[in-house]
Amino acid sequence: MTLQHHDHQHDKACAGQCIFDTDLHHFERDVIEASHKQLVMVDLWADWCGPCHFLTPVLLRVIPTYDGKVRLAKVEVDEGDNMKIAGKYGARGFPTVLLFKNGEEVARFHSAKPEHFVREFIDEHLD
């Protein structure tokens, strides 16, 4: 269940780039460096994970409404070396969602959450 940039072309404020896949080799650029310009939410997920499939549509609805102030990096932990990202950040279960600002993790949540929770989670960290 890999997301492609073109799946989100309807999102004009983000020019289709607010929601994207990343991996271990691009994490520094896509998340850490990018978080100096805007919030970057990282969804650590797995295809076999039921709660991950519940959370994904919630995130896909919420992120585009922030007009480019928040980006969502999707990391499928079972692809390549991506589990190393989960290990580095101590993710014990999936989904785990991390929020980065100014190059640092500032918050996280675990498991599937409703839309209002995700909005409050983001709003707490917007400038």
Protein language model features and the residues they cover:
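The canonical Cys-X-X-Cys-His
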Residues: C49-C52, V97
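Thiol-based oxidoreductase modules, predominantly thioredoxin-like and allied folds used
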Residues: F20-T22, L44, L55-M83
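A short beta-strand-turn-helix
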Residues: F20-V40
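Detector for the c-type heme attachment site
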Residues: H53-L55, Y89
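Structural cue for short, hydrophobic secondary-structure segments
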Residues: D43-W45, L99
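N-terminal targeting signals for export/organelle localization
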Residues: M1-D21, D127
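Short pre-active-site segment immediately N-terminal to redox-active cysteine/selenocysteine motifs
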Residues: Q38, W45-W48, G93
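Non-catalytic, surface beta->alpha helical segment in thiol-disulfide oxidoreductase systems
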Residues: R92-D127
